[in-house]
């Protein structure tokens, strides 16, 4: 992004699409803060890690406490900050409807702390992940 912004008109970029979910949090170390400081939105693709998160026992336990699905919890987590857009895949109308409900969910700090304990935030700079 820094190289892009150094190009003529490079600072016209409005969004950076990155792999971002509970299992892939490396962008939190430096890219997400950089995007924020440069007023560039972040678009999180694969917020469910291609469905892998839906089978995660830790996520399931936290979702059960909150009364929402694993998918809704994962999507709501990516949307906890106003400057992140989440683009989950939806294979059916039911999935679309459930995903839409995730936009209305505000996760309490206690749940966010549990998610941080279950899915550790980065402790150092990481290479950018892609699928």
Predicted regions and their residues:
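Beta/alpha (TIM)-barrel catalytic core signal, keyed to glycine-rich beta->alpha loops juxtaposed to Asp/Glu
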Residues: 1-122, 127-131
């Amino acid at each position: 992004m820094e190289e892009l912004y150094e190009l003529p008109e490079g600072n016209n970029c409005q969004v950076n699409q990155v792999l971002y979910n509970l299992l892939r949090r490396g962008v939190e170390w430096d890219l997400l803060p950089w995007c924020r400081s440069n007023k560039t939105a972040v678009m999180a693709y694969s917020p469910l890690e291609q469905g892998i998160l839906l089978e995660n026992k830790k996520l399931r336990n936290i979702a059960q406490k909150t009364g929402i699905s694993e998918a809704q919890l994962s999507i709501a987590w990516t949307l906890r900050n106003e400057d992140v857009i989440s683009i989950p895949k939806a294979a059916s109308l039911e999935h679309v409807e459930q995903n839409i409900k995730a936009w209305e969910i505000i996760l309490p700090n206690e749940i966010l702390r549990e998610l941080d304990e279950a899915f550790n935030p980065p402790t150092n700079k990481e290479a950018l992940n892609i699928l």
